[in-house]
């Protein structure tokens, strides 16, 4: 592992932050009701993972391409996940912006808004041979995907017909 600025990390963070900043003004109706019931442990893990991932992707230059090798396939896979993440957001912003839209699957990926960026981080960690980012990505995934799955479960539970 080599310290140094990662422009790939910066690009990934921009791809994460820009749609989330737009989302802050386009949250689905009722989102706050779900957010106030979030599991505190999952929220803690999510926040720790977010902070660690944000720092780690910027400070290791190993995430930048270093010439051609088959290892670039890991980086390409991470980039594909991020492009799919952007497409997920485009679909959400063009939708009715409901809770169902927000917690929907995309291309068969469940709760895509949480799963795709976490998967991208894990693939980037493998590409950069960075165990710190791998651990941070796992922590982020447990928290972020866990929260989204809980919200999705609540949402699906509300839609079940009464017997």
Language model: regions and residue ranges:
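Transmembrane alpha-helical segments that form the membrane-embedded catalytic/substrate-channel core
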Residues: 15-26, 82-93, 145-150
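Membrane-helix exit/interface motif
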Residues: 56-66, 87-95
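Hydrophobic alpha-helical membrane segments
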Residues: 80-89, 103-129, 135-144
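A cytosolic-side transmembrane-helix exit/cap motif
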Residues: 30, 92-102, 151-163
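Helix-coil boundary and interhelical linker segments in multi-pass alpha-helical membrane proteins
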Residues: 1-10, 58-74, 123-134
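Membrane-interface helix-loop junction between the first two transmembrane segments
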Residues: 21-38
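Juxtamembrane helix-loop boundaries in multi-pass membrane proteins
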Residues: 34-49, 98-117
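Core segments of transmembrane alpha-helices
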Residues: 47-61, 78, 82, 112-119
């Amino acid at each position: 592992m080599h310290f140094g600025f990662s422009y790939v990390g910066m690009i990934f963070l921009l791809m994460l932050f820009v749609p989330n900043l737009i989302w802050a003004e386009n949250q689905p109706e009722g989102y706050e009701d779900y957010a106030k019931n979030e599991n505190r442990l999952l929220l803690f893990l999510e926040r720790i993972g977010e902070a660690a991932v944000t720092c780690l992707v910027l400070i290791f230059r190993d995430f930048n391409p270093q010439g051609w090798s088959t290892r670039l396939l890991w980086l390409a896979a991470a980039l594909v996940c991020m492009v799919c993440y952007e497409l997920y957001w485009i679909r959400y912003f063009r939708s009715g912006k409901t809770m169902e839209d927000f917690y929907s699957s995309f291309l068969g990926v469940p709760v895509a808004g949480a799963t795709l960026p976490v998967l991208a981080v894990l693939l980037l960690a493998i590409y950069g041979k960075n165990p710190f980012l791998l651990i941070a990505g796992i922590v982020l995934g447990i928290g972020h995907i866990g929260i989204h799955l809980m919200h999705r479960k609540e949402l699906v539970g509300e839609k079940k017909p009464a017997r």
